[in-house]
Swiss-Prot record:
The lineage of its organism: Eukaryota, Metazoa, Ecdysozoa, Nematoda, Chromadorea. This is Hookworm platelet inhibitor 1. Keywords: Disulfide bond, Hemostasis impairing toxin, Platelet aggregation inhibiting toxin, Secreted, Signal, Toxin. It comes from Ancylostoma caninum. Detected in cephalic glands. Hookworms inhibitor of platelet aggregation and adhesion. Native protein inhibits platelet aggregation induced by ADP, epinephrine, and thrombin. In addition, it prevents adhesion of resting platelets to immobilized fibrinogen and collagen. May act by binding to glycoprotein IIb/IIIa (ITGA2B/ITGB3) and integrin alpha-2/beta-1 (ITGA1/ITGB1), respectively. It is noteworthy that the recombinant protein fails to inhibit binding to fibrinogen (through ITGA2B/ITGB3) and collagen (through ITGA1/ITGB1). The RGD motif is not positioned at the apex of a tight turn, making it unlikely to interact with the integrin. The keyword Iron does not apply. It is found in: Secreted. The keyword Oxidoreductase does not apply. Disulfide bonds join C24-C65, C78-C146, C141-C154, C174-C186, C177-C195.
């Protein structure tokens, strides 16, 4: 666990981006600071992945209130299984001080199972695939109590994931941002490792 904390400290040192998370419904277990932390955590991991795996068009993620609503509908079912391909689920049996960090580290730990850049739904990499799918540029998360356990769900968009599909394209980081269209450029807030814009 301590190695994950060191990695997190290193990747969150990349950048701090301002965001307006106040447009989402206010929740008992999820505030704007947590929304921001989920977003920055994902972008930090994506930047580290882009650097180490040489991804050519990894997008910066932004927080999305519509995806948060979908995540809450799923989380309130208290299932420990994802309801869709574009969903990560984590369940804690004990109280944790930092829910985004705990869930993010759990999902990120699948990096050690990742073999190549093609997604295999029978592998143990569904969560990491969602975190680093290069065309995902939105996320929304939910935190709910279910019979004394904390359920964390994050939904990702746009839909892209599928068995046999490519998780990321190789190449120099940011070298293919323009594949997403005019106006998509390299994000210097993330050391020119992630693409930003729509």
């Amino acid at each position: 666990m301590s190695s994950y904390l060191l990695v997190l400290v290193a990747i969150l040192g990349f950048a701090y981006a301002e965001g307006d998370y106040s447009l989402c419904q206010q929740r008992e277990k999820l505030d704007d600071d947590m929304r921001e932390m989920f977003t920055e955590l994902h972008n930090g991991y994506r930047a580290a992945f882009a650097r180490n795996y040489k991804t050519s068009k990894m997008r910066t993620m932004v927080y999305d209130c519509t995806l948060e609503e979908k995540a809450y509908k799923s989380a309130e079912k208290c299932s420990e299984e994802p309801s869709s391909e574009e969903e990560n689920v984590d369940v804690f049996s004990a109280a944790t001080l930092n829910i985004p960090l705990e869930a993010g580290n759990s999902w990120w730990s699948e990096i050690f199972e990742l073999r190549g850049k093609v997604y295999n739904k029978n592998g143990k990499t569904s969560n990491i695939a969602n975190m680093v799918w290069d065309s995902h540029d939105k996320l929304g998360c939910a935190v709910v109590d279910c019979s004394g356990k904390t359920h964390v769900v994050c939904q990702y968009g746009p839909e892209a994931k599928g068995d046999g599909k490519t998780i990321y394209e190789e190449g120099a980081p940011c070298s293919r941002c323009s594949d997403y269209g005019a106006g998509v450029t390299c994000d210097d807030d993330w050391q020119n490792l992630l693409c930003i814009g729509h």
